Every structure is written in C-alpha cells, then in structure tokens.
C-alpha cells in the first residue's frame, strides 16, 4: 500500500504529459518508489511522423491499460483527452491486435478542476475566477472532482466544494487555500468512485 490516505488502494503508475511535473518526482521518491511514465504530445508527434492527436490519446490509453487500474485520476494533467483515450478505457472500443489491453468493465476517469461546475471551464480557471472576484462579479469559486467526458470539465461532479474569496487576499494566497481543498477532496472522490467499482 503506497497511499496512506486510501489504505485499501495502491497507485500503480504516475503518468505525466509534462516532464517537470512534481508528481513524477514525488512518485520516484516514494518508499517504495511508484512507477512513472512520461509522454508529451509534441514529443510523440515528433517521434511518429504522420501521427495525430488521437493517436497520442490512444497511446496514453495503452500505457494506462497495461497497468489494469480500477480508476484513473487526473490531477495536474494538462492535455484534453479525447475519444481516442476515453473509448478504450470505458470499453466502447478495443485495442487493435491486443486483447490483453482491452477492458471488460469501464474504468472510471475522474479529473480535478479548480472551479465550480459550469464556471471557468478549461485552463486558467483560478486566474479567471480571481479576476472576476476583483471586478466584483463573484464572491467565491471552488473546486470539483468530476467524471471525465469528451466535453472539457462538463462531466458529472463527484464532489464540489465552494471556496470563498477573502477581500485583500492575493491570488497566491487564494491559490494556496484552494490547493488545500483540492488535496482533501481528490482523496474523498477517489475513495467514493473506487467504492462504486470495488465495494469493500
């Protein structure tokens, strides 16, 4: 067990599309170390002339499926995963020429997004929310863990938590408070979805 916050779970792989992602460092320094993998879209496309973004998503799915996970948790993943990924992990499509990588039960995929449902979807959510607060348009934002679907940040929320803005607070201070909430609810949401897949 390498996840004290989730005693009945084990992280089988930390995969990143950013070489400098801190998650890769933390995984490598874990005792025992957690396996890691890195694959950036740009690198993949350079190494595979003629390949497409969907081919990349398929390759990411293959990396994930080799680990036979019960859940995929996206936290800090900075690439929008399309149907090339989603159809393979939810079983709508099979991996060509490799039955071992094909799933019989859908693997849930959840994502951490630093905003409330239907507010500030996509990248830069914290900055856009803070700017709206500065303009007096909102008094709070929040964090959600949602199921991943084709449309960005539109999947069904698993957990939503409101985080109020504080007058005079810098964006860095707000972001620090927001991250504390993220760390708490990512564990709760992972546990909740795992219990749906593999009840104790």
Spans of features found by a protein language model:
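One-carbon transfer enzymes
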Residues: 1-200
